Amino acid sequence: MTYEQLLQQATQKVVSYDKEESAAVLLLESVADLKANELYLKAKEKVKKEIVKEFNALLDRYLKQNEPVQYLIGKSCFYGYDFIVNPAVLIPRFETEELVENVLYRYDRHFKGQELDVLDLATGSGCIGITLALEEKNLHVTATDLSEDALEVARTNNKRLQAGVTFLQGDMLEPLKGKKFDIVVSNPPYIPLNEEVMPLVKDNEPHLALFGGEDGMKFYRIILSGIAPYLKEKAMICLEHGYDKKEEMIRLAKTYFPSAKVEVLKDLEKKDRMTFIYVGDFKWEN
């Protein structure tokens, strides 16, 4: 059997389960240790029996046991970098890439060329903090998480990608004593406890990283009510949140930072996905 035939057979099976066709490609690339272009270059080559066996076993786990592809192959692409992931950490989402992109854009706009201290709260796999450190060498990142298992994954990613991020274990603001930051960024758990969640997500990803209390706002209240002592005189707070939380985020931001400028940004699907809070002396163009 050739790679082309194996992939066609697998794609038909994936379609019959009403699942993502790209999953078959990702699984085969991983099992055969091939990069994206290499799979198509080898389309007419015969596949080794052991590769076929391993690939079909993983495909069955994806289709029949509903396991995420990213956990099966042990990695997820984020902002062009491969991050190791496992069930201890949330699988990085496209929306979070937009959060990183907006942080970098606003760094250039308000702090360009300056060396800054950045805090990544509830880091999970480390994808936010590590990417910021890799994309902008002037950003010195500290990342925290409650889960030691998650931090083990994040430290592994940090070492592989040589990002130079510092990691602290503790509950939200707990490990920050004596530290101050220019930028605080976080994608905390924000799904309300009673909200219906896709089985693929609910049955596989860590609930600690998914659910944000009864209304999904628990961790935003913790962050915004307690972060002030850890901010420098001029600081930017950058938060990803549920698309329906715009008014609540503005109200919360203004409660704890009444003189700050608050900016709510939309994601690529035109949903209100990020809130940026500017504390201190920021210059704005008319």
List where the protein language model places each region.
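An acidic site on a long C-lobe helix of protein kinase domains
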Residues: 51, 92-95, 219
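Short, Lys/Arg-enriched, disordered terminal segments
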Residues: 1-16, 107-115, 177-178, 261-263, ...
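Residue-level signal for pocket-adjacent positions within structured domains
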Residues: 34, 42, 67-68, 73, ...
